[in-house]
Amino acid sequence: MITLQRTPLFDVYAKYGGKTIDFGGWELPVQFSSIKEEHEAVRTAAGLFDVSHMGEVEVKGVDSLAFLQRVVTNDVSTLKVGGAQYTAMCYENGGTVDDLLIYKRGEEDYLLVINASNIEKDYEWLASHVIGDATVVNVSSEVAQLAIQGPKAEGILQKVVSEDLKEIKFFKFKNDILVDGIPALVSRTGYTGEDGFEIYCKSEDAAKLWEKLLEVGAEEGLKPCGLGARDTLRFEATLPLYGQELSKDITPVEAGIGFAVKPNKEADFFGKATLKEQKENGAPRKLVGIEVIERGIPRTHYPVFIGEEKIGEVTSGTQSPTLKKSIGLALIDVKYAAVDTEVEIEIRNKRVKAVVVPTPFYKRSK
């Protein structure tokens, strides 16, 4: 029997009604109340997520920048201390190793945040390509991560932080902030399409912080949220999930995150030739939004057709809690990717009519 990994918050899930599932080898809460309720809380008030299963890797040393420039697609040289950057790591053929965040904590000090399912693979990938005076250390077990997301997130977090959170702009962070007396890195980032913060602290401090935030946020409607709502929220905002929109067979350009690929940077990074070609001349496939016109919900790997020709497949799909529509993301032949193109999705051996629609499905009003 496989023993599932647990985050430092596992013991407090039950107190808040958490229902756990096996998520890539981790025992994590899929929901606390209901996915719909938690989803709506984040869109209208605020939600608190345990994201401690994510991986953290420290990269330090004189050659840390040169090393990162070689292994990621974005231009890390543009990052200033206190800044965060979204990027990807690719194989030589352009397929994706992982998507990740890089935090620049010092001139020779970077924190990489990687997907839970890829921690070992990513660490080995990074370690095998180290150059010069750069060190790569997996600190995942020492670090916990909480995400507070939603329009009321700032006001709630401000109650337990003395620094003015308005000073932390989007994709910026402050290190060594005290959150209710607990040292943490606080960044204005997230995976929901809403404003919010991600808080990195020592594993042993996570449970205390979780309970304190839920206590001070109760009045504003802060709810504990599970993986179910995290997925529907990121999906509506058209944020890719590794293993679905991104994989070793899908490039960042195909997946719609070409903005994180900088083929004109000087460094010769893995996948550069393929990604440069795709950015300049277009990729053969494109990730598009689809709305199902008839009954049925598109799910991962459901085939997409025009007539008898299979043109691609669904990567993610759901009944959108915000839009009240059955929608999906599909990776299809670029020839058919224009908005308003009529397609069919095979749902349980039956062809169902759908149409290509613009993405993101949801964008918050500023």
From Swiss-Prot:
An example Gene Ontology molecular-function term: transaminase activity
Catalytic activity: N(6)-[(R)-S(8)-aminomethyldihydrolipoyl]-L-lysyl-[protein] + (6S)-5,6,7,8-tetrahydrofolate = N(6)-[(R)-dihydrolipoyl]-L-lysyl-[protein] + (6R)-5,10-methylene-5,6,7,8-tetrahydrofolate + NH4(+)
Superkingdom: Bacteria
UniProt keyword annotations, A-Z: Aminotransferase, Transferase
Statement: the UniProt record of this protein carries the keyword Transferase: yes
GO biological process, one term: glycine decarboxylation via glycine cleavage system
Signal sequence annotation: none
EC number(s) given by UniProt: 2.1.2.10
One Gene Ontology cellular component annotation held by this UniProt entry: cytosol
Quaternary context: The glycine cleavage system is composed of four proteins: P, T, L and H.
Task of the protein: The glycine cleavage system catalyzes the degradation of glycine.
Protein family (similarity comment): Belongs to the GcvT family.
PANTHER family attached to this UniProt entry: AMINOMETHYLTRANSFERASE, AMINOMETHYLTRANSFERASE, MITOCHONDRIAL
Record-given protein name: Aminomethyltransferase
Organism: Bacillus cereus (strain AH187)
